[in-house]
């Protein structure tokens, strides 16, 4: 019999907040609604989170770091650039599809962060895009990737992958794995040089 995984109260609150924000939006959801939905009082809310923005940060702040940490070893692997791009895009799509609600909140509400949190998020996004762009540049140099603006290619590829969040649900007639494979195939087909 599998052991029950013990979830901390804080993790439970974060999971519930993800569902709440994905349904109603961050700005539109009041602190009282959050407390009511989480089954806590407003004073208890402040025991776990400094502010509503802190709650948002706890939900989305780590997502960019996760993508970057997963991408670094793939980007420098001893493989052809097209193979590394395939693996990078697969990992990106897989991570999005494993965390659909949290990433929907990330893309819809990231502009609600201020100060150091906003700067950290933007820095992580920039580093992630630079990492992918470097692989595209290497692929262009070797003739594997078509010539053109590598920054634009990165933005278009990431935009394609991120657009999955706008319409994918588990009820779609295609599995997450099939969707990820098809998306990566189309993304790479758009980047690779014609033989």
Name the predicted role of every residue range.
Residues 84, 97-116, 166, 170:
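Amphipathic alpha-helical segments used for helix-helix packing
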Residues 1-8, 195:
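N-terminal intrinsically disordered/low-complexity leader segments
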Residues 91-94, 98, 129-141, 160, ...:
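C-terminal peripheral helix-coil segments that are non-catalytic and often amphipathic
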Residues 62, 73, 91, 101-105, ...:
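Short, solvent-exposed amphipathic helices
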Residues 65-69, 115-141, 151-155, 178:
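Amphipathic alpha-helical packing segments from all-alpha helical-bundle domains
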Residues 9, 13-21, 92, 187:
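Short hydrophobic clusters on alpha-helical segments that form packing/core surfaces
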Residues 12, 20-54, 58:
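Helix-turn-helix
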Residues 58, 72-101, 153-157:
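Hydrophobic alpha-helical connector segments
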């Amino acid at each position: 019999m599998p052991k029950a995984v013990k979830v901390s109260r804080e993790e439970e609150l974060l999971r519930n907040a993800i569902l709440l924000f994905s349904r109603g939006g961050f700005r539109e959801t009041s602190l009282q609604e959050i407390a009511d939905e989480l089954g806590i009082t407003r004073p208890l809310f402040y025991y776990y989170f400094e502010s509503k923005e802190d709650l948002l940060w706890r939900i989305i702040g780590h997502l960019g770091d996760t993508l970057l940490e997963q991408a670094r070893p793939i980007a420098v692997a001893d493989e052809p650039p097209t193979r590394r791009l395939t693996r990078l895009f697969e990992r990106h799509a897989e991570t999005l599809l494993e965390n659909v609600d949290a990433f929907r909140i990330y893309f819809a509400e990231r502009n609600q962060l201020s100060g150091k949190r906003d700067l950290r998020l933007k820095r992580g996004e920039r580093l992630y895009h630079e990492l992918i762009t470097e692989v595209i540049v290497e692929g262009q140099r070797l003739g594997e990737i078509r010539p053109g603006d590598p920054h634009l290619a990165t933005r278009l590829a990431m935009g394609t992958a991120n657009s999955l969040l706008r319409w994918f649900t588990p009820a779609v007639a295609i599995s997450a794995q099939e969707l990820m494979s098809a998306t990566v195939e189309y993304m790479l087909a758009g980047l690779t040089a014609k033989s």
